[in-house]
From Swiss-Prot:
Keywords from the named record: Methyltransferase, S-adenosyl-L-methionine, Transferase, tRNA processing
Protein name as annotated: tRNA (guanine-N(7)-)-methyltransferase
Biological source species: Serratia proteamaculans (strain 568)
Similarity comment: family membership: Belongs to the class I-like SAM-binding methyltransferase superfamily. TrmB family.
Class in the EC hierarchy, top level: transferase
GO cellular component: tRNA methyltransferase complex
């Protein structure tokens, strides 16, 4: 497993260039189980980053609808979705290796063959590896809201990013976002409404009820008991 989650970029003078990232990589300690999964299951389900388009049909060994999830955390929801939808391919991206290890362990225990995982910056993966018009759905669940105003520029949902996602979706493909931070939900809606190539699937042109396709997490259930809200947004590529 190659553990460089970002690729260095240099200017014409050879100086390293800084790109605003939507994540801070806090490298937590791996449990023995997570390390075992990385050592043994990454060769089966792991996908190394490459700066050229990947053949998705070859990657999964079949031609099937493909779902990309960005930032899957510990992977519980992703594994559940892959298990419930064996007719679909699932590609998950996460920059924190403990989460990748946990996901690999759970996916192996569930005997999943339709799941692949990556440990790299999702923006670079989308820019360089994912062919245009190849994805049926892109999922972005509970991304870091970067609460402080001075950090808002770090939010992954910005106009260039959602335009990039649109290019990677098939016509009719869906970009599904969810957040438990209302100001971020409002920001997401504002950004999406500014892009002409999407159609909001909400009948009220704002948020949709949580679809059955997105499993409830323990964190979300706890939040519901405390009266916390969750906002789902689903936008379809229309052109």
């Amino acid at each position: 497993m190659i553990n460089d989650v970002i690729s260095p970029e240099f200017d014409e003078n050879g100086r390293a260039m800084r790109r605003i990232r939507s994540f801070v990589r806090r490298q937590g300690r791996l449990t023995k189980g997570q390390q075992h999964a990385l050592d043994n299951y990454w060769p089966v389900m792991g996908v190394e980053y490459q700066a050229e388009p990947v053949d998705i049909t070859a990657l999964f060994g079949r031609d099937a609808p493909t779902v990309l999830e960005i930032g899957f955390g510990m992977g519980a929801s992703l594994v559940t979705m892959a298990g419930h939808n064996p007719q679909q391919n699932f590609l998950g991206i996460e920059v924190h290796s403990p989460g990748v290890g946990a996901c690999l362990a759970d996916a192996t225990e569930a005997e999943l063959s339709n799941l692949r995982v990556m440990c790299h910056d999702a923006v670079e993966v989308l820019e360089n590896m994912i062919p245009d018009g190849s994805l049926d759905m892109v999922q972005l669940f509970f991304p870091d809201p970067w609460h402080k105003a001075r950090h808002n520029k770090r939010r992954i949902v910005q106009t260039p990013f959602v335009e990039l996602v649109r290019r990677k979706l098939k016509v009719g493909g869906v970009f599904h976002m969810a957040t438990d931070w209302q100001p971020y939900a409002e920001h997401m809606l504002e950004v999406m409404n500014g892009i002409s190539g999407y159609r909001n699937l909400s009948s009220d042109n704002d948020y949709v009820p949580r679809p059955d396709s997105r499993p409830l997490t323990k964190f979300e259930l706890r939040g519901q008991r405390l009266g916390h809200g969750v906002w789902d947004l689903m936008f379809e590529r229309k052109e």
